[in-house]
Swiss-Prot record:
Residue stretches of biased makeup (Low complexity): 79-93, 131-257
Keyword Translocase assigned: no
InterPro entries according to UniProt: EF-G-like_DII, IF2_II, IF2_N, P-loop_NTPase, Small_GTP-bd, T_Tr_GTP-bd_dom, TF_IF2_bacterial-like, TIF_IF2
Gene name of the record: infB
PROSITE patterns named among the record's database cross-references: G_TR_2, IF2
Identification of the protein by name: Translation initiation factor IF-2
Length: 939
């Protein structure tokens, strides 16, 4: 038991810490409640304060002197001590108040009475307390007014445990007094004696005890008659939690002459108010008095007698109790009525909300005002809603569909995405042709290839062989397309050696040709434009027939051409592929007939058919403004039959056909499928690649043209906004507008092209497919830009530059053209664009030069460079490069930049300044300083 503290031993012995410290104070050692005790000290204390045997504590029985028996609630002691004890002769009321004595003589303590001799369990004494009632009653733990206490107990009271004699307490007997273990005297308390006196910690008239219990004129840690409390309580008839002075308390209850909880020093006035138990000569009345509360507050009159106080307290307490009970009932009734009303409103609200659900059809983008109009709410309500979400908007601000849907859902509106209708596509839309009306039509063939590989020579050879009809003078009319008759079968050739018209047609969705003839020189093999032509044809989805030209030359190597073309997916039939290879010679006319036969065979295999008995529909091949004839358009009729006098529309142009001229220069009145003709009668020059359609009337044709004009303007704006670039690629992927990323690669060597192509293709993911539509060697030319514009592609160039014309076209067509010197940078940029993390490009910009003139040393700073700015400016946030001769000695930030003693942000040319460099002091006079900043380069 060594090291037991004073307060622990005091608690065990049911005494105060001060009792122990006072006992041990004779020794030299100073003791506090937290001081440790040795075994010898503990033993001496136990011997001093050990309780006496119970048999010695039983007082002699005395006749009861109360007017009414009261039940004892302490079941352990209910059979002991049938009669109360007489008060000790030597103990007197120190106040000298005889009336107090008389009144005290009427008290009967239930501990000294048998349960069988008492009235019923819930006591009938009106001055009683709940389960422990009597006239000036007994309580379990914390009791007031002439009362019994539990542990450290005082005069006129009985104790709870192991108790009991008349007016006496556990182990200690005395007239009008209780002595727990070492406690003395009437109106006195443990270890301290005397009327009007205080013990242990807290003081008050008719004094206080140590902890939680109250006695007549005394309390433990709580308040007595005219006294103060232990810790947070004030004297003068008032205390927090437990009070004495002619009163009883249950736990948080107040007695007469006392103030409310946390009462003020000096306030009394027969007042009791705390919790639900009563004091002031009215010890609780919880059972017999309908939970009535105690007497009202009044100013205490020192001249008033205890009897008069008791009398007033009872009368006033009854009145006050009724009043408080009535107020409590009213408050409870009001509170219940409030709670009852709330649930009734909720179901009605929900039903209302279900009734007001609306369905909205929303476009891709709309303004706040338009959304509010569709929802039938005030625009200010939407602005407020967004403001509360931390978004500051105006009613004219545009939001996308997702944001609009989120707002609408909060207003109980269900949204559907508006299906965008392409008006032009609807106008150009065609119904399926019935099979029984379809007839075979001539194939449309385009000749493509590298420069000087013999495209023009091959066309001339075909024309010389099969074109018989010529105009007078022997000059063939060149209208951009012509027909060749091969054994009674017609073949239409498009005389478009360049790729501009071809890509323009594909850009507008027109399938102008059925078969592409790829001309490759047998002595040169595959060249850059050959690869470009292959990519164009594949992008258009047309059949490719390879014409290996110049086989008459000595160094011709057909097998080499076949081998080179296999790298681009064109594998000869005799090599196990599906591509037709025809060796020809435009010079000797060798292989021309075989080439034409293969064209007819391919057309037959593809089953090229059209319906001639319908309104005509075709494509504009070329168009020009003739001085004598006006707008002239060379067209290719693809479906139906076109007649002179038909009303037609071609994009934004319309008119009535006045004349038609065929490829031989003859005027014709009708033109069937796959027939090229020149038409006159349009109001303007149409663009190459526009769709030409016959209409029922000129008015209808004009209406179609006007629709094309208005929709064309909108499409131009949309195309400008949605042109593909790496910067905006991720947003377009997220919006679902991008499923395929087309890339054109140009490099200085073929190996770089192949390496990048394979690397970029591997970047494809679930949301977007990377597709390299063209890869070639050489500078970026206009044809590359036109292909990129038509295919909505990005051009990536390595160690090559675009020519002037290509740069102009790229700027005009808004084509994203990127130049790289390192392959991996391009791969990283495309990968970052796919992930939406494209970082801006920064480049170094030199802003100024300075010379170090003198060195200054400063403690704690290091070397300071005294400089003069010779050119430009030096800024505080710039990065400097210090050179000594041709050697760079430092590159890093400036730690400090001063002009005289002032820290500055910038020093201009001709100004002296002082500079300190971060973690660098090895500077010398005549060192040169170059300052630069990093600026973002527009991408």
């Amino acid at each position: 038991m060594a090291n037991m503290r004073v307060h622990e031993l005091a608690k065990e012995l049911n005494i105060t810490s001060k009792d122990i410290t006072d006992m041990l104070s004779n020794s030299e050692k100073t003791y506090k409640p937290v001081s440790g005790l040795t075994d010898a000290e503990i033993s001496s204390v136990r011997k001093k304060f050990a309780p006496a045997p119970k048999v010695e504590n039983k007082p002699a029985a005395q006749p009861a002197k109360q007017s009414q028996p009261v039940k004892n609630d302490n079941r352990d002691n209910r059979q002991q001590n049938q009669a109360p004890k007489q008060p000790q002769q030597g103990t007197q009321n120190k106040s000298g108040n005889a009336d107090d004595k008389k009144h005290i003589s009427q008290v009967y303590f239930p501990q000294n009475s048998s349960r069988d001799k008492n009235s019923r369990r819930d006591n009938n004494n009106r001055d009683g307390q709940r389960d422990n009632n009597g006239g000036y009653r007994n309580n379990d733990r914390n009791n007031g007014g002439y009362r019994n206490n539990d542990r450290g107990n005082n005069g006129y009271r009985n104790n709870d445990r192991n108790n009991n004699g008349g007016y006496g307490n556990r182990d200690n007997n005395g007239g009008y007094r209780n002595n727990d273990r070492n406690n003395n005297g009437g109106y006195g308390n443990r270890d301290n004696n005397g009327g009007y006196r205080n013990n242990d910690r807290n003081n008050g008239g008719y004094r206080n005890n140590d902890r939680n219990n109250n006695g007549g004129y005394g309390n433990r840690d709580n308040n007595g008659g005219y006294r103060n409390n232990d810790r947070n309580n004030n004297g003068g008839y008032g205390n927090r939690d437990n009070n004495g002075g002619y009163r009883n308390n249950d736990r948080n209850n107040n007695g007469g002459f006392r103030n409310d909880r946390n009462g003020q020093s000096g306030n009394g006035g027969f007042r009791k108010d705390n919790d639900q138990n009563r004091g002031g000569f009215n010890g609780g009345q919880r059972r017999n008095n309908d939970r009535r509360d105690s007497a009202p507050k009044e100013e205490f009159d020192f001249s008033a007698k205890p009897d008069s106080r008791r009398h007033d307290s009872r009368i006033d307490s009854k009145k006050n109790d009724r009043k408080r009970d009535n107020e409590a009932k009213e408050n409870l009734k009001f509170a219940n009525s409030r709670f009852d009303k709330k649930p009734m409103t909720k179901p009605e609200k929900k039903e209302k909300e279900e009734e007001t659900i609306k369905q909205l059809v929303l476009p891709d983008t709309l303004t706040i005002k338009e959304l509010a109009d569709k929802m039938k709410v005030a625009p200010a309500a939407l602005v407020k809603k967004l403001f509360l979400q931390g978004k500051v908007v105006t009613i004219n601000e545009e939001i996308d569909y997702d944001a609009a849907e989120e707002i609408a859902l909060e207003f109980n509106c269900i949204c559907e995405h508006e299906e965008k209708v392409d008006v032009i596509a609807e106008l150009l839309k065609e119904d399926e042709e019935p099979e029984d009306k379809l007839v075979p039509r001539p194939p449309v063939v385009c000749v493509m290839g590298h420069v000087d590989h013999g495209k023009t020579s091959l066309l001339d050879a075909i024309r010389e062989t099969h074109v018989t009809a010529k105009e007078s003078g022997g000059i063939t009319q060149k209208i951009g397309a012509y027909q060749v008759n091969v054994n009674g079968n017609l073949i239409t050739f498009l005389d478009t050696p360049g790729h501009e018209a071809f890509t323009a047609m594909r850009m507008r969705g027109a399938q102008a040709t059925d078969i592409a003839i790829l001309v490759v020189a047998a002595d040169d093999g595959v060249m850059p434009q050959t690869i470009e032509a292959i990519n164009h044809a594949k992008a258009a989805g047309v059949e490719i027939i390879v014409a290996v030209n110049k086989i008459d030359k000595p160094n011709a190597n057909i097998e080499k051409v076949k081998q080179e073309l296999t790298e681009y997916g064109l594998i000869a039939e005799d090599w196990g592929g599906s591509t037709t290879f025809v060796p020809v010679s435009a010079h000797t006319k060798q292989g021309i007939d075989e080439l034409l036969d293969m064209i007819l065979l391919t057309a037959e295999v593809n089953e090229l058919k059209a319906n001639p008995d319908r309104k005509a529909r075709g494509i504009v091949i070329e168009a020009e403004l003739d001085k004598g004839r006006g707008p002239v358009a060379s067209i290719l009729v693809q479906k139906g039959t076109l007649h002179v006098g038909d009303a037609v529309s071609a994009g934004s142009c319309y008119g009535k056909i006045r004349a038609m001229i065929d490829d031989k220069g003859n005027r014709v009145k009708v033109a069937g499928p796959s027939t090229p003709v020149e038409i006159l009668g349009l109001n303007d020059v149409p663009n190459a690649g526009e769709i030409i359609m016959a209409a029922d009337s000129e008015k209808e044709a004009r209406s179609i043209a006007e629709t094309f004009i208005s929709e064309g303007r909108k499409k131009l704006l949309d195309d400008t906004k949605h042109k593909v670039s790496l910067d905006a690629l991720f947003e377009q992927i997220q919006a679902g507008n991008m499923k395929e990323l087309n890339i054109i690669i140009k490099a200085d060597v073929q190996g770089s092209v192949e390496a990048v192509k394979s690397s970029l293709v591997r970047l494809s993911n679930e949301e977007v497919v990377v597709k390299v539509i063209h890869g070639g060697v050489g500078n970026v030319n206009e044809s590359d830009v036109v292909l990129a514009s038509a295919s909505n592609a990005i051009i990536i160039a390595f160690n090559v530059k675009p020519d002037n014309q290509a740069r102009i076209v790229a700027e005009r067509e808004k084509v994203d053209l990127r130049l790289y010197s390192v392959i991996y940078n391009a791969i990283e940029d495309v990968e970052a664009a796919l992930k939406g993390m494209l970082e801006p490009i920064y480049e170094e910009k030199i802003i100024g030069h300075a010379r170090i003139m003198q060195i200054f040393k400063a403690s704690g700073v290091g070397n300071i460079a005294g400089c003069i700015v010779e050119e430009g400016r030096i800024t505080r946030d710039s990065v400097v490069r210090i050179t000594r001769g041709s050697e760079k000695v430092y590159e890093g930030p400036i730690a400090s930049l001063k002009h005289f003693k002032d820290e500055v942000k910038e020093i201009k040319a001709g100004t002296e300044c002082g500079m300190v460099f971060e973690k660098f002091n090895d500077i010398q006079p005549e060192d040169m300083i170059e300052a630069h900043i990093m600026v973002e380069v527009p991408r």
